[in-house]
Amino acid sequence: MTRRIGILTSGGDCPGLNAAIRGVARAAYAMFDAEIVGIQDGYRGLIEGEWREMRRDEFSGILTLGGTILGTSRQPFRTMRVIGEDNVDKVKSMKKNYERMKLDCLVTLGGNGTHKTANLLSEEGLNVVSLPKTIDNDIWLTDVTFGFHTAVDIATDVIDRLHTTAASHGRTMVVEIMGNKAGWLTLYAGLAGGADIILLPEIPYDIDRVCEAVARRANAGKAFSILAVAEGAMDREEAAMKKKQRAEARAAMPYASVSHRIAAQIEQKIGVETRVVVPGHIQRGGSPSAYDRVLSTRFGVHAAQLIRDGVYGMAVGMHGHDVVHNPLREVAGKTKFVPQDHQIVQAARQMGICMGD
């Protein structure tokens, strides 16, 4: 029996998307009679009916390719049940186009928002399997997401390269690393890159403690310091605020970001020349690492196995060294934060790295 599989990629792009698409398709072709439908630009394509029949040869040569051959877009979950000015019922449209494409199932590749919408569609009666994609590594019930380790490699390389210029000029360097809610990327890259100070959203910092750490290194004859700062890092005052109040305070501050504020405060408080480096979207671009190619492929193959067995409403993930699946309803709407007592946090502290608190 032929199974028609719709595939979409949603949210921010990251390395490994094409490898995962390839994994789903090639495993499906090998295990059963499959037809693959490529849905363009994420959930927007499912809403607007933008899709195309995929040929087998389109899945060749994409294992190492960054980005996504299907395109992507951000369609916030909070708007999915909201009928806007265009008078479009998004959920109704997605269900209608699912039927119009004659799909047997839908495979979604994305982060937390993607999983929430995937769960919504599952609850609406569609057959859905979701794969965990994000450089933030913050999806619930999976030890790792594809794209994360490639981003760690990139951010680590940035920190590595800053060591030489920081040492040459005797400067303190603040590296702003992606991660608005969860600090996994900053934690891993900071430790791998030999950062002296690591600031995460989960551990509110005290700027005086940060300055003390920089001054202590200077007094010990260290000509420079490296700070790995998550874009969502916050000080203790901000941490005590409500979410809306904190957002308003951030919008009103005279700095481009929290990293720029920290750099200015270091210069003002202890007179140490400080520069900010923001690698930005470089962290989510380019070819996936060997690790992410293998991980993405394994996730894709597992999705095909679930489709073969008729098991839907599932989110694929990793537990230890094993690829597993969990009910979407248990994954959607939850975020995997860095625990303050995590072994890697403890290791950083025991090495004398300042965590800002």
Regions found by a protein language model. Name each.
Residues 8-9, 39-40, 71-72, 108-110, ...:
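Short beta-strand segments
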